Regions:
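Bacterial N-terminal signal peptides
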Residues: 9-22
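Secreted/extracellular ectodomain signature
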Residues: 26-155
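Positively charged n-region of N-terminal signal peptides that target proteins for export
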Residues: 1-4
Length: 155
C-alpha cells in the first residue's frame, strides 16, 4: 500500500513538474516584460507636505532631488499646504538655495492658494520659480488620477 502511494506520488510529480516549470518561466517572462515597460515610462511623482518640521522639509527636498538626479526625465512635483509654507518663502526659508536648485533641475513646487490666503501670504513672497494651485489637495488628487505616484511626507 505504501509503495503504491509513493509510486503514485512520484508519477504525479513527474507529470506535474513540467507544467510547474512552464508556469515559472512564463511568470519570469512577464516580470521581465513589466520591468522593461516600467523603464520606458518616465517617473511621475507628487509629494504631499503639510509640516513645518525641519526633518520633513529636509526629507522632501532630499527625496525629490534624488528621484530627479536618478531619472532626469522624471516629472516631480512638491505640493505644499498647511504649515509647510515657510519652506518656499523668500524671507523665511532656510532652504531657499536648495529649492531654487531643484526648480532649476525641473522639480515643480506648487503652493495651495487656500493655504496662502489662510496665512496671509502673497505670490510675491514666494521663492522665484515656485508656482501656485487653487487647492493643494485637489492638485494631488488630479495627479493621482493621471497615474502619478504619491508620497506623503510626515515628520
Amino acid at each position: 500500500m505504501k509503495r503504491n502511494f509513493i509510486s503514485s506520488g512520484l508519477i504525479m510529480a513527474i507529470v506535474l513538474l513540467p507544467g510547474l516549470i512552464n508556469i515559472q518561466v512564463l511568470y519570469a517572462q512577464k516580470v521581465a516584460t513589466s520591468i522593461q515597460s516600467d523603464q520606458s515610462v518616465a517617473y511621475q511623482v507628487v509629494f504631499d507636505i503639510t509640516s513645518k518640521d525641519a526633518v520633513a522639509q529636509n526629507q522632501v527636498l532630499r527625496d525629490a532631488g534624488l528621484i530627479r538626479d536618478a531619472h532626469p526625465d522624471a516629472q516631480v512635483e512638491v505640493v505644499l499646504y498647511g504649515q509647510s509654507l515657510d519652506l518656499i518663502l523668500k524671507d523665511k526659508s532656510t532652504h531657499a538655495d536648495e529649492v531654487k536648485s531643484l526648480v532649476d533641475k525641473g522639480v515643480s513646487f506648487k503652493v495651495c492658494h487656500i493655504a496662502m490666503d489662510h496665512h496671509h501670504i502673497s505670490e510675491s513672497q514666494l521663492i522665484s520659480g515656485v508656482g501656485t494651485v487653487p487647492d493643494g489637495i485637489y492638485e494631488i488628487i488630479s495627479k493621482q488620477k493621471q497615474g502619478w505616484g504619491y508620497i506623503k511626507i510626515t515628520p
